[in-house]
Amino acid sequence: MSKYNFVFALITFLGMSFVPVDKKFPNLNLKTLEGKSVELNKSFAKNKLTVVSYWATWCSPCKKELDAVKNLYDGWKKDGIEVIAVTIDNAQQLNKVKPLANQKKWSYIVLSDVNSESLRLLNFQTIPQTFVVNNMGEIVYSHSGYTPGDEFELDKKLKSLLGK
């Protein structure tokens, strides 16, 4: 293996997140952009499936992923699938989130985790990080990173989980 291939493989491996599927999603209390507290596990119980996408305003692939998901969201919502976008922006960056979400016309729920509690409890280091959680609060799918077209893989996985 050439030196460059080895370095690429090492960087890819180190950038991966090791979040086991079938693990219970931690009981997190996050905030809406208006400052209201939301208990995620209660949100999961209201939907057949919930897509939880972790992102930040400074992360270009994150914004591309959320834009791509926006185009599929109406169909998902009809099938009982909710999308929750959780920003990990720190307190200084948080004032950029709401204007960005409004500008991009993201109609799904946007929450903030300024203390990065999710990263610690779910053991991931890279964003975007996407989880699919069932109504029992179990992680049934996890994906790290974004390449154009990943949203179609996610759509296919959601349909499979719904038995479609």
Model regions and ranges:
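N-terminal targeting signals for export/organelle localization
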Residues: 1-31, 141-143, 152-153, 164
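Conserved hydrophobic packing residues within short motifs/helices of P-loop NTPase cores
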Residues: 50-52, 84-86, 131
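Structural microenvironment flanking redox-active thiols in thiol-disulfide oxidoreductases
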Residues: 63-104, 115-120
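Short, internal strand/loop/helix patches
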Residues: 100-136
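Thiol-/selenol-based redox modules, centered on thioredoxin-like
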Residues: 132-164
